[in-house]
């Protein structure tokens, strides 16, 4: 149960310590080394038709588009969280800190989240023991007892993506913009994804920060993107 408080979401623009110069793009065709269309991939076959989810029933579901998530939530009597709800839950009661466990990425050298170790995308060191997604509860929970709010896989939230929304949004419990707008691809409907994934690291996306946000095409599914449901307290009160 997440306490009802002011819900305010953030992004890289509010993170004074983040240096965009550290986002290296000097690798030859670096984007294409990381991403490739794989015919036949779906949630039952995450990396292609010859793969399966056997032995991964305790991993997050992936390769689902935004509307897949909506339909599952509807079937389960739940819903997707708003971006603000998601961030508040992610912080686990620790306001003003970079990560849901504090400000140090590896306290006492301990891995707190499933992320990429080494230089992305050319050097994968696998120091945390996972090449891709990890079973839920592989890493410590946050202050609210929630697992994998940072890393493992990105998570769809309900909000349309608009980069300037928080310049004019309500300060309390913002519900997201009424329409999608990505200046780089204005004709494509996009929603927000949060939390980062096993592909994130300090020279790539740092998506495991509490305030990090990503935009995703609603028709796009990926091996590193899933979702979680929420339920309103009024739905469970007798």
Predicted regions and their residues:
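Functional-site microenvironments in short loops/helix caps that host divalent-cation chemistry
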Residues: 2-210, 214, 218, 223, ...
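Short, structured beta-strand segments at or near domain termini in extracellular proteins/domains
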Residues: 223-236
